[in-house]
Amino acid sequence: MSGADRSPNAGAAPDSAPGQAAVASAYQRFEPRAYLRNNYAPPRGDLCNPNGVGPWKLRCLAQTFATGEVSGRTLIDIGSGPTVYQLLSACSHFEDITMTDFLEVNRQELGRWLQEEPGAFNWSMYSQHACLIEGKGECWQDKERQLRARVKRVLPIDVHQPQPLGAGSPAPLPADALVSAFCLEAVSPDLASFQRALDHITTLLRPGGHLLLIGALEESWYLAGEARLTVVPVSEEEVREALVRSGYKVRDLRTYIMPAHLQTGVDDVKGVFFAWAQKVGL
């Protein structure tokens, strides 16, 4: 998908619904704990190395929120998966946060952490690192308390539907900001579906609102236990073009090249992108 004059549907089958159905079926085998072990425990979850992917993602988020430009009352996290790190810097800027995921098992995993249930995944190292990066002297326990208090709901979502949250959603709409990490490319069978999914979630955002998007670069598959999930490979330029087509001004776009020691055989990801984009309009 290159060239500003190309249709969002260029290069794709006329109907992506069969591909989307296959993706949805494959995700029924998704194992949240296996995914967390693969990506948020060492080596990828080792936050001691400042050049690691975990510190890089946390820095991108913290630095963007530190500008003071991404703020408001309501934020929606699109396709949260079983993770919360993507909201650690956001929670001091938004008092009403909605987390979402297509899979009930991921929503249950989030619920365990939010309710501080025994056996919930331990995000304390991420919380500590976020506090360190932000440099405000906040203790990680307070950071986690604030995040738990400000997540008001965990809802189902389907980014392939024109109304991703369904009709009559309890989430306040439109939101002041959206965050989404490793969702759109992981659930889209082709670039046209990726573009449409981005269009769909953009309807949840107010004009002038901000989107912080994190995703995989040039990845075609990843493992989550017994599940081997397909991913639409995207490049930095394809991400930029998709954002512009969906009506955004790209404020920042950064890339991280995955080093060899973090290529652990659980996927074929080449890198990670971070995009800060603002929805055009008043």
From Swiss-Prot:
Effect on the protein upon substituting N9S: Slight increase in protein expression and enzyme activity with octopamine as substrate
**Record field: catalytic activity:** phenylethanolamine + S-adenosyl-L-methionine = N-methylphenylethanolamine + S-adenosyl-L-homocysteine + H(+); (R)-noradrenaline + S-adenosyl-L-methionine = (R)-adrenaline + S-adenosyl-L-homocysteine + H(+); (R)-normetanephrine + S-adenosyl-L-methionine = (R)-metanephrine + S-adenosyl-L-homocysteine + H(+); (R)-octopamine + S-adenosyl-L-methionine = (R)-synephrine + S-adenosyl-L-homocysteine + H(+)
**Amino-acid positions noted as binding S-adenosyl-L-methionine in the UniProt annotation, renumbered to this chain:** Y35, Y40, G79, S80, Y85, D101, N106, D158, V159, A181
Top-level enzyme category: transferase
| Protein name, per record | Phenylethanolamine N-methyltransferase
Return any one Pfam family short name: NNMT_PNMT_TEMT
Q: What is its EC number?
A: 2.1.1.28
Q: Gene3D superfamilies per the record? A: Vaccinia Virus protein VP39
Relate the protein's function as given in its record.
Answer: Catalyzes the transmethylation of nonepinephrine (noradrenaline) to form epinephrine (adrenaline), using S-adenosyl-L-methionine as the methyl donor. Other substrates include phenylethanolamine and octopamine. Also methylates normetanephrine.
Which gene holds the coding sequence for this protein? Answer: PNMT
| Taxonomic source organism | Homo sapiens
A Gene Ontology CC term for this entry?
Answer: cytosol
Any known activators or inhibitors? Inhibited by methyl methanethiosulfonate, phenylglyoxal, tetranitromethane and diethyl pyrocarbonate. Inhibited by 4-oxo-1,4-dihydro-quinoline-3,7-dicarboxylic acid, 4-(benzo[d][1,3]dioxol-5-ylamino)-4-oxobutanoic acid and 1,4-diaminonaphthalene-2,6-disulfonic acid.
Superkingdom, according to UniProt? Answer: Eukaryota
Upon changing E185 to A/Q, the result is: Strongly reduced enzyme activity towards phenylethanolamine. Increases affinity for S-adenosyl-L-methionine
Which PROSITE patterns did the record assign? NNMT_PNMT_TEMT (PS01100), SAM_MT_NNMT_PNMT_TEMT (PS51681)
Q: Which residues carry this modification: Phosphoserine?
A: S7
What are the recorded Gene Ontology BP terms? catecholamine biosynthetic process; epinephrine biosynthetic process; methylation
